[in-house]
């Protein structure tokens, strides 16, 4: 199963010390570079940064379709745009994204998006 995640599902679980649940449920999770950068930004907080740095099951992957990212950027932020584009590229089984506009953009592209 191929899973791609946006920033919020990872950071929210990391903040409450439950990031390992993602690994238990999904195994490996792909994240685009923009999401990785957001997770390691000092604004994310030390708890999130430390959890992400030790989560060896998170795989960072570059998005190739920059045109799709640019198109999505008219609707969502860069992390969401890259996560959606990566999910399209790798034909992900599921995209974990909790922002409503991001879920709608993903659904419009035929992706199975989940998160609330």
Stretches with model-predicted labels:
Residues 113-116:
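Flexible glycine-rich active-site/ligand-binding loops centered on an Asp-His dyad
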